[in-house]
Amino acid sequence: MSAVWKLAFALAFIVASATSALGDRPQKNVEQELVKAAGSRDNLTSSDFHGFALYAAEVDGVIYRVAVPEQPAAGKPWVWRARFWGHQSEFDVQMLKRGWHVCYCDVGGLFGSDAAVERWDRFYKFAHETLGLHRQPFLEGMSRGGLIVMRWAARYPLQVSGIYVDNAVMDFRSWPGATYEDRKGSGKGSAASWKQCLEAYGLTEAEALRFQHGPLNHLEGLAEQRVPIFTLINEADDVVPPAENSDLLVSRYRELGGPVTERRRPDLGHHPHGLADPSSLVRFALASLER
């Protein structure tokens, strides 16, 4: 073979390799699959999320968001965030830097109800089966996001690597209901959100006060699978009082033998959420895949 032909073959190989690598880019795959799911490229938007590609699409009337790392980590692990996308995102950014995807499926106004769980079921199928993400996402729930995180996890304990709940609602009677076990709760509550919550669950107020299917009622499966839970608790929280929410999660989960890590901040109210230095949470999430 002449030197000219050898050079031509070498150049062709380089071009083909580059084209193949371009086609395998995680960003390109996510973009294409979201367009398919949404049914039209008009339903897709792309933007920058702290230096990473972020794609959002409306799928059957529901907003999906997927932030994509430059190079996915082995097994394509992912953080599944509930509510308040982009708020106090230090942890999310650190996980993206480590090759994790960060995903979101909007369940606003559903307060972790069965309709919210079913919506998350559909997103999980998309993320795991279509995008090929890990079968066990790491769940992240701030404030009212704790309701969907814990209710979905309780239903599917084998499909969860670990859980991070941040000043999180564990009982909708406490927030937004401002009631607790047939008595006035210690939090502020929200009349408008309480009405919306009752509608989402299809309950009267009397039925809601007797409801026994919240996150605190179904921890056994998670404990049996030893799913690790990281709790951030601002002890002066008068919106989502720890005594009616996070404290009960910690005590009940420990009684069941479940592994739980507490991070307490004694002088803070419901805000701020998140950790300015999320290194301890990052280590916790990374370890959750190795158990």
Predicted features along the sequence, with ranges:
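N-terminal cap/lid segment of alpha/beta-hydrolase-fold proteins
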Residues: 29-74
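C-terminal catalytic histidine-bearing segment of alpha/beta-hydrolase fold enzymes
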Residues: 67, 239, 243-291
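Alpha/beta-hydrolase fold nucleophile elbow
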Residues: 131-143
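Alpha/beta-hydrolase active-site loop
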Residues: 111-132
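The feature captures the conserved acid-bearing segment of alpha/beta-hydrolase catalytic domains
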Residues: 185-247, 251
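Hydrolase active-site cap/lid region
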Residues: 151-205
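Short amphipathic alpha-helix adjacent to the substrate-entry channel of hydrolases
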Residues: 87-103
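Glycine-rich nucleophile elbow surrounding the catalytic serine of serine-hydrolase chemistry
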Residues: 141-151
